[in-house]
């Protein structure tokens, strides 16, 4: 896989304004582009986050690049995980959540299977 180590970062003030505006407002402001599919749902309701996105493309059944992406994350980031094909594998659980939390990552968005959801809540 390809790893980009020096990611462009947005200004903290811009991120805070985005967080305050909310998803629906941002979606409208960006000509209704970039909204995730309706099957991607939060496991924790009522939480709003904005941060720099660290993106990773994963192959179902292989979480190596997921771990590589975690190493690229900084405090305030959001990890965005997309599989190369439909995947219900439990890629993410409490162990990776602890790793992200120790790096200060504020969220994860993914079209992937999540395990340990009760613990993560």
Question: Over which residues does each language-model region extend?
Answer:
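Feature captures the catalytic cores and cofactor-binding loops of soluble hydro-lyases/lyases
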Residues: 1-121
């Amino acid at each position: 896989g390809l790893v980009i180590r020096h990611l462009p970062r947005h200004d903290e003030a811009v991120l805070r304004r985005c967080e305050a505006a909310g998803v629906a407002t941002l979606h409208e402001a960006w000509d209704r582009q970039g909204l995730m599919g309706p099957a991607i749902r939060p496991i924790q309701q009522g939480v709003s986050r904005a941060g720099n996105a660290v993106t990773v493309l994963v192959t179902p059944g292989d979480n190596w690049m997921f771990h590589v992406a975690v190493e690229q994350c900084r405090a305030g980031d959001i990890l965005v995980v997309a599989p190369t094909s439909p995947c219900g594998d439990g890629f993410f659980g409490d162990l990776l959540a602890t790793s992200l939390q120790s790096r200060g990552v504020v969220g994860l968005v993914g079209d992937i299977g999540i395990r340990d959801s009760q613990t993560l809540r």
